[in-house]
Regions:
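Secretory targeting signatures
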Residues: 1-38, 603
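Glycine/threonine-rich phosphate-binding loop and adjacent beta-strand/alpha-helix elements that clamp
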Residues: 38-63, 72-83, 388, 400-603
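Accessory cap/linker subdomain of secreted extracellular hydrolases
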Residues: 39-65, 133-134, 138-145, 150, ...
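N-terminal cap/lid segment of alpha/beta-hydrolase-fold proteins
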Residues: 56-109
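Cap/lid segment of the alpha/beta-hydrolase catalytic domain
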Residues: 109-189, 365-379, 502, 559, ...
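A catalytic-pocket lid/entrance helix-loop region that shapes and gates access to the active site
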Residues: 176, 201-270, 320, 327-334, ...
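Residue in the alpha/beta-hydrolase core beta-strand immediately N-terminal to the catalytic nucleophile
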Residues: 197-199
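Short beta-strand/loop motif that positions the catalytic acidic residue
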Residues: 310, 316-318
């Protein structure tokens, strides 16, 4: 037989190839079945706007549902030695928690834990209490349960001492509470189904418990995600000596909502309960004579202890219009301290999501939509983060499982007009400072506080300053250094910053004159003494259009702050000063668009 023609050989090979092609997926199929799953989808933040999201729920969801299912709830109670923690109180106390495991633990897989540690389980007056730990908490609990258990995470809900079924003293953010929290983190990290890595999540008090845990530095605590979380009690209730109204009753209000008003409550009472009742009024009235700073409040400062003791990662979530847990919990501290910047400079992995929302979660659209003008209202259209569940998923994947790309240590900051951008740090470290000599502005009034001779109303001072020739992007913590004269050892100034053209509120600052040097330490002030009040504004990220100037409205009090304890007898005379603000010039390269849709629930 003669040689095969080249065209015939080619046709034969092509025919063979097409015959074998359908079988190609079968070769090595047993190996593919045992190979690891493809890594989850981690979209770039700039691409998220183009993706399909679950828009119709009350909270955000991950892009891809996980393969596992939650198992039935389990509960645990374990004993903690409290013999050395309280002057009086039980020598041992119990921590109670409930937890849900993903179905892959039935195959022996070890999983990380996401926990919410709270006083809010079975919280409230008898008959109207919130759910117990064995019921998935509304909002934050459902968010974790639905998003992360299917991806192989355990979820735990823990009650602090003296609440729900945890015994012992309700030691409001004190050392006893911290010990119970630390013990819970240790327990969760040591179970035979745990991979040893614990992350904490939650807002407000449930953010405070995260800092309490970090202060005691369990090796199992890998990351915290405080959402408007309290970092220390004194700066929560006081800003440069100005007292919030709740500072007078905070401890007792919590205690009254955690007891059942029966004989079992005796174990919940410890000396700090009584101390807490008096701490607020004494600090408010005595200022520099306050005896509580070195004990009661110092014990309840956690962020400084975590800074010394712990080496985990922090995803900081803060509402820039949150006047419940103010931004200075993140961007403040003792004189010379900015906790966000200091943690970053010390080498911690720190990321921030800083929206113009109030005391809410990034995806809590039902609350976002109710914000007023000057308090985030101008940013509502771009505020809700429907990608929050995915963003946090990528954080947990890396820090609790060690998979996926390392999240960038940046700050996602929203400007007051709604625009989001990426900053390496916030406040930006490349900002330039602009200063305005208030003597060049129009001043109305010369005293703050006291009673006006005309009309009997409170005296106020306003400064209205000329407009700028270009847009001014304020980004950081402006300062107001006021030249004042005191009438006695007391008095207070609340300063609201406004757009002079529109009256739009941009931010505020407050200070008790006894804290004129800034920080936490008061000094005695004498009648007639001239001094400079070194006021610092809460964090602001806002645009002031070209041609617009600033207006400062100085009153005795504002927002939720009390008037000074000295009442009408302590007016402060204002003799001018300097307003300074950090401003940045951005070209738009770091602006990103968040996922939004006309079909979304918030629209």
């Amino acid at each position: 037989m003669g040689a095969t023609h080249p065209m015939m050989r080619t046709a034969f090979l092509l025919s063979l190839l097409f015959l074998l092609l359908p079988l190609s997926g079968c070769f090595g199929s047993s190996e593919d079945e045992n190979s690891p799953q493809a890594p989850p989808y981690y979209p770039d933040i700039n691409d998220r706007q183009f993706l399909d999201w679950e828009w119709n729920g009350s909270y955000s969801m991950v892009l891809e549902q996980g393969p596992y299912t939650p198992l039935e709830v389990q509960e645990a109670t374990f004993e903690v030695d409290t013999s050395d923690i309280w002057e009086t109180g039980p020598p041992t106390s119990n921590v109670h928690l409930s937890y849900w495991l993903p179905s892959n633990t039935e195959d022996g897989e070890k999983v990380p834990v996401i926990a919410v540690i709270s006083p809010y389980f079975s919280y409230g007056q008898p008959g109207s209490e919130s759910g117990a730990t064995n019921v998935v908490g509304a909002g934050r609990g459902e968010f974790i349960y639905d998003n992360y258990i299917p991806h192989g995470y355990a979820f735990a809900q823990v009650s602090v001492f003296g609440t729900e079924e945890s015994s012992g003293c309700f030691d409001y953010r004190g050392a006893g509470e911290g010990l119970g929290i630390h013990s819970a983190v240790e327990w969760l990290g040591q179970q035979n189904w745990s991979n040893g890595n614990v992350g904490l999540y939650g807002k407000s008090y449930e953010g405070a418990t995260q800092w309490e845990a970090a202060a005691l530095a369990s090796e199992h605590l890998k990351t915290i995600v405080p959402i408007s979380g309290t970092t220390a009690l004194h700066p929560l209730l006081y800003k440069n000596g100005s007292a919030e109204a709740r500072s007078q009753v905070m401890h007792m209000n919590y205690f009254g909502s955690t007891v059942d008003y029966n004989g079992d409550d005796l174990d919940n009472i410890c000396p700090d309960i009584v101390e807490g009742i008096f701490a607020g009024p004494v600090t408010y009235g005595l200022g520099e004579l306050d005896p509580y700073m070195e004990n009661y409040y110092e014990e309840r400062s956690h962020i400084d202890k975590a800074f010394q003791n712990w080496n985990g990662s922090i995803y900081w979530i803060q509402g820039m219009q949150d006047w419940n847990v103010d931004p200075h919990q993140v961007f403040g501290g003792p004189s010379g301290t900015n906790w966000y910047l200091d943690y970053s400079a010390a080498g911690y992995d720190v990321r921030g999501m800083l929206g113009q929302w109030e005391h809410n979660y990034p995806d809590q659209w039902s609350k976002h939509n109710a914000q007023d003008s000057g308090y985030g209202g101008e940013a509502i259209h771009n505020m809700t983060r429907w990608d929050w569940g995915q963003d946090l998923f990528e954080w947990f994947e890396y820090y609790l499982k060690g998979v996926g790309p390392k999240p960038e240590n940046h700050a996602q900051i929203q400007r007051n007009d709604g625009e989001w951008r990426i900053e390496e740090l916030w406040p930006p470290q490349d900002a330039t400072w602009e200063s305005i000599d208030l003597s060049n502005c129009d001043q109305q009034g010369n005293s703050v506080g006291g009673t006006s001779v005309i009309g009997g109303g409170q005296q106020t001072v306003t400064f209205t300053c000329e407009g700028f020739t270009q847009d001014m992007h304020i980004a950081g913590l402006p300062t107001l250094h006021l030249d004042v004269s005191a009438s006695m050892d007391g008095g207070q100034i609340f300063a609201e910053l406004q757009d002079a053209e529109t009256g739009l509120r941009l931010g505020h600052a407050t200070m008790d004159i006894r804290y004129y040097a800034g920080g936490y330490d008061p000094q005695t002030v004498f009648p007639g003494q001239s001094l400079v009040m070194l006021m610092e504004f809460q964090g602001i990220d806002a645009i002031l259009p070209a041609g617009h100037g600033i207006k400062l409205v100085l009153t005795e009090t504002g927002e939720d702050y009390l008037a000074p304890a000295c009442g009408n007898s302590c007016p402060v005379t204002v003799d001018g000063g300097t307003f300074s603000f950090p401003q940045v010039d951005r070209n738009g390269d770091t602006v990103f668009v968040t996922p939004q849709s006309s079909e979304a629930a918030n629209n």
